């Protein structure tokens, strides 16, 4: 894994240095394999003058310290306007339409593997780019497949399904072959200051702020009723955009007379009436679906699964694989029938398909299929 391969010598790799442990170790491993490595730090969000929610300055400092330790150059680039136009505006539009988007997927598509790759190509003359994502690449019959990362708990293929096989072919994913614990061990052994740095969680542009506070600065909230699935009004919500299907916490519903002790879940967002519909129990019938329709399809190899294929999918990150059968309603709409009913499938999120270890691609969940 870390021995020099003569075919790598002279090949230039630009590593996306985030200031975290995964990109730090990626740069180190690629150097050990004989590549000519340089780092590139992206700034994707302009923080407020007073509150640096994304901690970009700290991350840049850590990235620079790692590059200094490894003896490699660190370049910087500002993609804030591209991020605003292609990721953030999409994020707001989806919330406004009552759906729950995944900005990380759009960031990978538009920024990390598009704007970054173009900059690395045109300005830095790269042969490859590399990221600290937990996925693997396999080259077979002239195309590059994307496989799940070895560490099943950290596998990030769900967030990368929009990549083309051409983008995968230009990308290296060194830590995808390792467990997270091994990555931290390597960083510690090499004396990299990021070895015990906490993994970033949540959405970069929100940072430590409360999600509701952040969203309300961009979209006006429209309070409305909370109703049971039987139509009884039992409370008020501050805005449908703050809630997602299957949500249990933060509903503000106390104990009600003549109701069981089972927790309440969001089972529907009625956009026409501006009503949040709730039901009791994680297996509430209104929470379950037997399948879905997805559109905005993207296949890593451009072909996609065959009509009638029995494969698996994930409708959210870290979900267990769901066995399913797929058929096509059109070139850009896939019909998915689950082997067993699934709870809290959410329009606006991504359905990502797998054939064993191979990430095939996916699409955006549009409509739920219920009996």
From Swiss-Prot:
A GO BP annotation: tRNA wobble position uridine thiolation
Pfam families in alphabetical order: tRNA_Me_trans, tRNA_Me_trans_C, tRNA_Me_trans_M
Key word ATP-binding present: yes
GO cellular component annotations of the record: cytoplasm
Positions with a binding annotation for ATP: 16-23, 42, 132
Site (Interaction with tRNA) residue list: 133, 349
Interaction with target base in tRNA as annotated region, ranges: 102-104
Region (Interaction with tRNA): 154-156, 316-317
Catalytic site: 107 (nucleophile), 204 (cysteine persulfide intermediate)
Coiled-coil blocks: none
Main location: cytoplasm
Keyword list, A-Z: ATP-binding, Cytoplasm, Disulfide bond, Nucleotide-binding, RNA-binding, Transferase, tRNA processing, tRNA-binding
Record-listed E.C. numbers: 2.8.1.13
GO molecular function: ATP binding; tRNA binding; tRNA-uridine 2-sulfurtransferase activity
Subcellular location field: Cytoplasm
Keyword Transcription regulation included in the entry's annotation: no
Disulfide bonds: 107-204
Catalysed reaction equations from the record: S-sulfanyl-L-cysteinyl-[protein] + uridine(34) in tRNA + AH2 + ATP = 2-thiouridine(34) in tRNA + L-cysteinyl-[protein] + A + AMP + diphosphate + H(+)
NCBIfam families linked: PRK00143.1, trmU
Function: Catalyzes the 2-thiolation of uridine at the wobble position (U34) of tRNA, leading to the formation of s(2)U34.
Family statement: Belongs to the MnmA/TRMU family.
Protein name per its UniProtKB record: tRNA-specific 2-thiouridylase MnmA
Lineage of the species this protein comes from: Bacteria, Pseudomonadati, Pseudomonadota, Gammaproteobacteria, Alteromonadales
Designated gene of the protein: mnmA
């Amino acid at each position: 894994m870390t021995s020099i391969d003569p075919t790598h010598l002279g090949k230039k790799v630009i590593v996306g240095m985030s200031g975290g442990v995964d990109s730090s170790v990626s740069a180190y491993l690629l150097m050990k394999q004989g590549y000519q490595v340089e780092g590139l730090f992206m700034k994707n969000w302009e923080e407020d003058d007073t509150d640096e929610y994304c901690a970009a300055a700290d991350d840049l400092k850590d990235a620079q310290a790692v590059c200094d330790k490894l003896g490699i150059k660190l370049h910087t680039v500002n993609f804030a306007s591209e991020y605003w136009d292609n990721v953030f505006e999409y994020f707001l539009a989806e919330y406004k339409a009552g759906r729950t988007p995944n900005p990380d997927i759009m960031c990978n598509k538009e920024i990390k593997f598009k704007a970054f790759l173009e900059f690395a190509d045109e300005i830095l003359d790269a042969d490859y780019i590399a990221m600290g994502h937990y996925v693997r690449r396999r080259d077979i019959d002239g195309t590059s497949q994307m496989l799940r990362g070895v560490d099943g708990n950290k596998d990030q293929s769900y967030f990368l399904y929009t990549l083309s096989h051409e983008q995968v072919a230009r990308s290296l994913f060194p830590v995808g072959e390792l467990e997270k614990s091994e990555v931290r061990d390597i960083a510690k052994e090499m004396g990299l200051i990021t070895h015990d740095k906490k993994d970033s969680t949540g959405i970069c542009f929100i940072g430590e702020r409360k999600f509701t506070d952040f969203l309300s600065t961009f979209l006006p909230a429209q309070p409305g009723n909370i109703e049971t699935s039987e139509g009884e009004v039992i409370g008020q919500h501050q805005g449908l955009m703050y809630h997602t299907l299957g949500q249990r916490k933060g509903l503000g519903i106390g104990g009600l007379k003549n109701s069981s002790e089972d927790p309440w879940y969001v089972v529907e967002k009625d956009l026409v009436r501006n009503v949040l519909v709730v039901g009791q129990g994680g297996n509430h019938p209104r929470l379950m679906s037997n399948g879905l329709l997805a559109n905005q399809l993207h296949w890593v190899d451009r072909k996609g699964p065959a009509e009638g294929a029995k494969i698996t999918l994930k409708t959210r990150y870290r979900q267990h694989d769901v066995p399913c059968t797929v058929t096509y309603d059109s070139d850009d709409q896939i019909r998915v029938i689950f082997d067993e009913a699934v709870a809290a499938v959410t329009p606006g999120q991504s359905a990502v398909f797998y054939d064993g270890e191979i990430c095939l691609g996916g699409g955006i969940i549009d409509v739920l299929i219920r009996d």
